[in-house]
Curated annotation (Swiss-Prot):
Protein name per Swiss-Prot or TrEMBL: Gut esterase 1
PROSITE patterns to which the protein is assigned, alphabetical: CARBOXYLESTERASE_B_1, CARBOXYLESTERASE_B_2, ER_TARGET
Keywords, alphabetical: Disulfide bond, Endoplasmic reticulum, Hydrolase, Serine esterase, Signal
Molecular function terms, GO-annotated: carboxylesterase activity
UniProt keyword Signal present: yes
Tissue: Expressed only in the intestine.
One GO term of the biological process aspect: cellular catabolic process
Active-site residues annotated for this sequence: 199, 320, 451
Signal peptide range: 1-16
Gene coding for it: ges-1
Amino acid sequence: MRVLLASLLIFGACWAGPVVNTNYGKVEGFEYGAAEVFLAIPFAKPPVDNLRFEKPEAPEPWEDVYQATQFRNDCTPHYRLVAQFSSYSGEDCLTLNVIKPKTIEKKLPVLFWVHGGGYEIGSGSQHGYEFFADRYTSQGVIVVTIQYRLGFMGFFSEGTSDAPGNYGLFDQAAALRFVKENIGNFGGDPDDITIWGYSAGAASVSQLTMSPYTHDLYSKAIIMSASSFVGWATGPNVIDTSKQLAEILGCPWPGAKECMKKKTLHEIFDAVETQGWTTGTIDILRWSPVIDGDYLPKNPENLINDAPIKPTLIGMSNKEGSYFATMNMGRVIADFGLSPEEIPKVDEDFISEIIDRKLLYNNRYGENRQKVWDQILDYYTKQGKPERDLNGFYVDRYAELLSDITFNVPILREITARVERKTPVWTYRFDHYNEQIWKKYIPEQAKGSPHANEYHYLFNMPVMAQIDFKKEPESWLQRDLIDMVVSFAKTGVPHIQDVEWRPVSDPDDVNFLNFQSSGVSVKHGLFQEPLDFWNNLREREGFDLVDPAYSKTTSNSEKDEL
C-alpha cells in the first residue's frame, strides 16, 4: 500500500505544472511546447454585488495553489447575443493570462496586451495562448493578456463622483499594476513593460499613457488602429445612455447606481434590447470612457501635455472604415454597414443623406450646419471624381469618410501631438490585403486593408478569411509584423528587414513605413489632406465632428450632451 501511495505521489509530482509565487498566493500553470502558460489569474476582487459599478479592489490572498490552467469567465459584453456566443461569460471576470518561456536566463521584456472590441465586446481568451507561445515568447518576451469590464458594466456613468464611469479603464490600470508588482516572479522585467493594443485596445493604451494612475507603470507603447483622440473613445452620449437605461429599468435618476446593482444581467440585457445596442450615429458607441476628472482629468488633446516621454509605435490600415462600411462587419457596435443590395445604389445623394442623418444630427454646427454639410459633401464626393465607375468611387469615398473621422484624423492628431512634445514616435501603414477577405460584389476601387486586417497576421485569427501563411507574401508580412512588435518591445526601436525606419521628424509631413504586397518602404505625408480638411473645419467652426468632447463651442443641444 505504501509503495502504491508513493508511486501515486511521484506520478502526481511528475505531472504537476510550473508554480509561481505572486503577492496574493501561488499559481500553477502548465507547459505548452517551450512555453509556460498561466491562465485566468485574478488581479482584482470579483466586481459583483456591492462592487458592481465600483473601482476594482485588490484580490483577496489565497492559501491553496491557484489552478491557472484554463480560461474562465469573459467579461459581460453589452449585448445578449454576443454573450451567448461566449463559452464563458460573467461578471466575475477580472483575470489576466501570462505566457512565458520555460527557460529564462535574464529578466525579459513584457508585452501587455489590451484587447479591442469598442469597449463593449472582446476578451483575453479570444486570442488563445498557442500563437503567442509559438511566435512571441519564443523570441524572448513575456506576453500578458488581460480582461476588463465592458459595456454597461464597465462604463455606466451618472457623471458624478459617486458614479463616474470608466470602471473598465480602472480595471486595465489595476491589471497593469498587478503585472508591475508580480511579473518579476515570472521572469519578467517590471521596468520594461510595453503596453499594446488594437482598436479600442489601442485607444485604451493611449489613455493608459496619459492617465495619472499609470504614468509610472509602463516603458513603451504600441497603439494600433485607434487613439484616445477619437470621438468614440470619450463618448459624448454615455451619460444620456446611462440615464435612459436606468429609466427603462425603473431606477431613479440621479442616484441610479444602487438600484442598478440589484438588477440581474437578464433584466439589464432586456433593457438594452429596448434601448438599442448602437447609436446609429458617427459617435458609434453607446458605452465608452468619459472625461471624469479622475482617470481622465481632461480631454486627451490637453492631457497628452502631461504624459511622460516614452517610445511609441503607432500604426493603421489604409482603408480602416471599410470594415464597418463595405464589409458590413462589427454590426453589434456600429451601424454603418452596406448590404450587397445597397452597394450598387451608393451615390452622392446617399453620402449626403448619411452626412445629414448620422454626422450632423442634433443640429450640430447650429446656424452653420448647411454650410458645413456642403463642405463635407464637396470634399468627399467632388474631389478626384472620375468620369467612369462612379459607384466604385462613391463606395470608396463613403468608407473614407468613416475612416477619416473615426480613425485616420484622430490618429494623426495624436502622432502630431506626441512628436511636438519630442516623443520618439514610429509610424506605419498597412496597405496589403488578401483577396479572400473581399466579397466579389465589392467594387475594386473600394478594396484595401480594412480595420482588423492585421489580426490575421499578428494573431493568426481568421477574422475575415482563412489565410494560408505558407504562401508569399503572407508569410513574410506576418513575420515582419511580429518582428516589428517584438523588436520594439525588446529594444524600444522597431526593426523590419534592413529598412532604415526613423521616428517621425516633421509632424506636417509624417514619415511612415508602408507595408504593401510588393514589400516595405518608407513614405511621407500620411493622410495629410484629410487631416488638413478636418483641422481647418474645426478651426473655422469651433466644433469638431472628429472629437465632439474637444469642441470649443456647440449648439445648445450639444452643450447639454457634453
